Design a protein with these regions (language model features):
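Catalytic alpha-helical scaffold of carbohydrate-active enzymes acting on polysaccharides/glycoconjugates
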Residues: 1-160, 165-232, 250-273, 280-331
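Active-site clefts of carbohydrate-active enzymes
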Residues: 230-247, 276-278
């Protein structure tokens, strides 16, 4: 890469992304808070000229229950554990977005589309789990078709995919390519970040990931995008955790991120920051203040090294063009 690149991707999912583990009772405040998070992030990104990929669950494109039901794929996953399926919770969904802020996102998607340098990608239609037992290839293909159609209703042509729970496999990359997807967010290379089933997410794995937010267990996290199975891997560098009350840990967390960004800018490589809007759903102002510090450092790196802010699709198109293949995104 000629210059270092800063990528932000957001897993935009509302309750669909956590319903197998959380409820409205214990996590509803975070989900409701997304109604304020999305406009606040968009304004901040516009103010700082920051590009972002919003990897959006396809079910969020519906504005009413009727529209949601009409958009469902005929073939659905038959998970061994039915509680991980979004379709298991359809009976909970309210009549429309005004009455149900947990499962609908149409107005927020429209708002995103009104801002510059913001890409709508896919987080699959149903928050599909590619590595869980019962998530067949045919069901995944039907899921992506439903996501494609839902996005097309708003004039969106999907170019990027973020796999739910980062469950990636070569087979699912091949199916993604069938639908014209060009970019995916690959996992970090260390063992505790590799793709795995939910039951394999043990305390050791989770503990190492948490510790890596503060200590350099997995190195600098600067990578180069690469062609993998015909798609461009725009690899993850760092999950942006919500703020904590421990000021010393927060300083360490900020240093961990900004030092890795500095390394990427200096080496002309990529730094990819990601999180979920609902991570900012409570303590919004504190989380925005932390993000502003990151963006302040990006501006320094932009001036010093020419570091760029790009969407996943734009990175993919640059890589594909370098390999003599065409791309169409320009963010």
């Amino acid at each position: 890469m000629q210059y270092g690149t800063f990528v932000i991707s957001l897993d935009f999912e509302l309750l669909w992304g956590v319903r197998d583990k959380r409820t409205v009772a214990d996590y509803g405040a975070n989900i409701r808070g997304v109604r304020d998070v999305v406009p606040a992030l968009l304004d901040l990104f516009a103010e700082r000229d920051i590009a972002c990929t919003w990897a959006t669950v396809g079910l969020l494109f519906a504005g009413t229950e009727e529209a949601m039901v009409a958009a469902l794929p005929a073939r659905k996953p038959d998970y061994a554990n039915p509680r991980i399926s979004s379709y298991h919770y359809l009976a909970e969904v309210g009549a429309d977005e005004e009455r149900d802020p947990y499962y609908y996102g149409l107005s927020l998607i429209r708002r995103i589309l009104g801002y510059p340098a913001q890409e709508i990608g896919t987080h699959t239609f149903s928050h599909f789990y590619c590595l869980e037992e019962g998530g067949s290839t045919d069901a995944f293909r039907a899921d992506l078709e439903a996501a494609r159609v839902a996005a097309a209703h708003l004039g969106v042509s999907l170019a990027s995919i973020v796999f739910p729970r980062n469950q990636i496999s070569p087979v699912h990359l091949a199916v993604s390519r069938e639908f014209g997807l060009r970019a995916f967010r690959g996992n970090e290379q260390t063992w505790f970040h590799r793709a795995r089933r939910d039951r394999e997410q043990n305390l050791l794995v989770r503990g190492c990931r948490l510790a890596d937010s503060y200590l350099p267990l997995a190195g600098a996290h600067d990578r180069e995008p690469a062609l993998v199975g015909g798609l461009v891997d725009v690899p993850a560098s760092r999950f942006l955790r919500p703020v904590s009350r421990n000021a010393a840990l927060e300083r360490l967390r900020l240093w961990r991120i900004t030092s890795a960004m500095e390394t990427a800018a200096r080496r002309r490589r990529l730094f990819h920051l990601w999180w979920h809007p609902h991570n900012f759903g409570v303590d919004l102002q504190e989380n925005l203040a932390f993000l502003r510090k990151i963006l302040d450092h990006f501006r320094i790196l932009q001036d010093r090294y020419g570091m760029r802010s790009m969407t996943m699709a734009a990175v993919a198109d640059e890589v594909l063009n370098a390999h003599g293949q065409s791309g169409t995104a320009h963010q």
